[in-house]
Amino acid sequence: MSLSGEYLGMPVLIDDLDKDNQAFYRYCGQNELRVQECLDCRLKRLPPTSACPFCASERMEWRPVEGRGTVYSYGEVHHAIQGAFRPHLPYHLLLVELDEQKDIPNPYDGLRLQGNLAELDGSLATKETVKKVGIGTRVKVSFKQMGDEIAMPLWVIDQEAEQPTTPWRYPI
């Protein structure tokens, strides 16, 4: 059965053939960030796939992760293609390196997840918050419900973590 919801007024549909993404967004709907872990090589992976990208095994389990990490990279969007994002310009799309599995299996490898920068209430980040975030900023996952069963993982500044004095930002 397909899963459906709404994010920023836009319809979201996860087809019933896409079991891996259905599972991921259902866990998010329970306010839980889970990733696939290979039962053979024990490496975790995102996005969800039908086989391990490291050893090609099809055996996996969903494992919870803490949901804290560091901004590895980001895009600051000033021209929204989707109309629902226009009131939130500029907004950040973050690539977050989770604390789990850093530099594994090789140096500079990691478990990374994309998502929008948000406020604690689940709304997209204000311009003031966007200006505070750069590479090295510590963030944690938050969830925005999209329907009865699914939620969108978002990133908020981790107020409990030590932050860089000046996170690196792309020059504009």
What are these regions (language model features)?
Residues 1-36, 133-134, 142, 147:
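A broadly conserved sequence feature marking short terminus-proximal activation segments
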Residues 32-35, 42, 49:
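Residues immediately within or flanking Cys/His clusters that coordinate Zn2+
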Residues 37-40, 54-57:
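Short, cysteine/histidine-rich loop/knuckle motifs that typically chelate Zn2+
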Residues 46, 60-61:
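Short functional micro-motifs and their immediate structural scaffolds
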Residues 68-70, 138:
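Residue-level marker of beta-strand positions
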Residues 72-130:
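Glycine-rich active-site loops that engage anionic ligands at enzyme catalytic sites
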Residues 101, 110-172:
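Well-ordered alpha/beta subsegment
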